[in-house]
A protein has these predicted regions:
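The conserved acidic donor/metal-binding loop of glycosyltransferases
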Residues: 83-87, 91
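Short aromatic/hydrophobic "clamp" motif used to bind/position activated sugar donors
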Residues: 79
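A recurrent flexible, glycine/aromatic-enriched loop bordering the glycosyltransferase active site
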Residues: 110-121, 131-148
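Conserved donor NDP-sugar-binding/catalytic core segment of glycosyltransferases
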Residues: 91-123
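Glycine-rich, basic loop-to-helix element that forms the pyrophosphate-binding segment
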Residues: 45, 59-74
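Cell-envelope/extracellular polymer assembly enzymes that use nucleotide-activated donors
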Residues: 1-3, 33
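Short, well-formed alpha-helical segments that are part of the catalytic scaffolds
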Residues: 10-26
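A conserved acidic beta->alpha catalytic loop
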Residues: 35-45
Length: 150
């Protein structure tokens, strides 16, 4: 159902956290494949991809071009782009599946972005409110996950 594309830039720690969060989706059959697109000259990410059972794509160029290259290599009709270090909330599998079914039923092209989660230890207040308003004005961030049909 989904191909997940993660631009890693050679940073192992953040990519591993994201991969660990995707395990339930793979076990549920929602994730068909994960592509790690790496723009570094390090072999670390290739080893991580091998151990995690991911596809690995080395790419030279901009981050946008790397994401496009990952999309071209993906095999699934739906693409999920995740920033390395993104850890999806527990309900992401159900929400993604419902979104895909809704889009298929409507026949209209749509894309979805993942909401930011509130850190459990933060004090909600004016600062969070200002951040929310800023996000509404500027639109989605590149750090938010994107779910889109081919």
């Amino acid at each position: 159902m989904l191909s997940v594309i993660i631009p890693t830039d050679g940073v192992e720690r953040t990519a591993v956290a994201t991969l660990a969060a995707l395990v339930p989706g793979a076990a549920a059959g929602v994730i068909r494949e994960v592509l790690l697109v790496d723009r570094s000259n390090s072999d670390v990410m290739e080893r991580v991809a091998d151990v995690a059972g991911c596809r690995f794509l080395r790419f030279e160029g901009t981050r946008a071009a790397a994401l496009a290259a990952g999309a071209r290599q993906a095999r699934s009709p739906w693409l999920m782009f995740l920033h390395p270090g993104a850890v999806l909330d527990a309900g992401w599998i159900e929400e993604s599946t419902q979104f895909i079914q809704m889009v298929a039923a409507s026949g209209k092209d749509r894309a979805g972005i993942f909401r930011y989660a509130r850190a459990p230890y933060t004090d909600p207040g004016l600062r969070d409110g200002l951040k929310f308003v800023a996000r509404m004005i500027t639109g989605p961030s590149t750090e938010q996950g994107l779910l889109i049909a081919r």
